[in-house]
A protein has these predicted regions:
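Nuclease catalytic cores
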Residues: 2-46
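Active-site metal-binding core of divalent-cation-utilizing nuclease and nuclease-like domains
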Residues: 27-95
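Surface-exposed beta-strand edges and their flanking turn/coil or helix-capping segments
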Residues: 69-72, 113-116, 159-160
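Generic detector of low-complexity/intrinsically disordered segments
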Residues: 72, 91-93, 128, 173, ...
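Catalytic cores of nucleic-acid endonucleases
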Residues: 84-86, 97-150
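Domain-level recognition of nuclease-like catalytic cores that cleave nucleotide substrates
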Residues: 130-209
Length: 209
């Protein structure tokens, strides 16, 4: 019997399947704003999810593995990482863990941290990066599908030629069993910290000068 694919392998499998779907449907757009282009890509991923028989949830809540710590910055107090975050999409399957999806125009986002933690939990993780140069390293267990675009100026509009089956996919390293076990242990510690925080009296809001 063939072994079940690991989360790492599933991330690559799903990135390849999504690329094939976008190629078969001749996905493209012309003259869209940044928000419109992101929505167009999001709809395309949701259509692929539906065609695969999965349920799609937008802005799906997720929790970072490492518990937040109260930091100070000038006259403000803030939690880092934040107590909660949201995935652009979570694709729920009947026969496996949900797939985490982030869609970004640049590397300057929290996608790396969110997908890293989802992969450490053993969940397939897809990062769809469109436009701009790729600078950020792909986290372990994550597959990145790059969809470059052209842009105009004044006003800025983005265009994307039909996706081909050669669109770039970059894979992170494998998540080792040791890294996953350590992460799951930290995840349990975070849950315990959340329970303790919920039981404490409410603290006043951030100090403002």
């Amino acid at each position: 019997m063939a072994p079940e694919p690991t989360a790492n392998g599933e991330s690559e499998i799903f990135a390849t399947a999504l690329r094939a779907h976008l190629s078969e449907t001749r996905f493209a757009f012309t003259g869209l704003t940044g928000k419109e282009a992101t929505r167009s890509i999001t709809r395309a991923v949701a259509e692929w999810s539906m065609a695969s028989g999965w349920r799609t949830r937008c802005e799906a809540p997720m929790r970072y593995i490492d518990p937040p710590r109260l930091q100070t910055g000038g006259c403000r107090g803030y939690w880092s990482p934040p107590w909660c975050a949201y995935l652009d999409l979570r694709l729920r399957r009947k026969d496996g863990p949900p797939i985490a999806v982030e869609i970004d125009r640049s590397d300057d986002s929290t996608a790396v941290d969110k997908l890293r933690d989802e992969a450490l939990r053993g969940r397939p993780a897809l990062w769809i990066r469109w436009h701009g140069a790729l600078r950020a390293e792909v986290p372990a267990g994550v597959a990145r599908l790059h969809l470059p675009t052209r842009s105009s100026t004044s006003p800025v509009r983005y265009s994307r030629a039909p996706v081909t089956d050669t669109a770039s996919i970059t894979l992170g390293a494998d998540v080792t069993p040791e890294a996953r076990a350590e992460a799951l242990n930290r995840d349990q510690q975070r849950k315990a910290e959340e329970k303790r925080a919920a039981a404490r009296p409410q603290a006043p809001g951030p100090i403002r000068c």
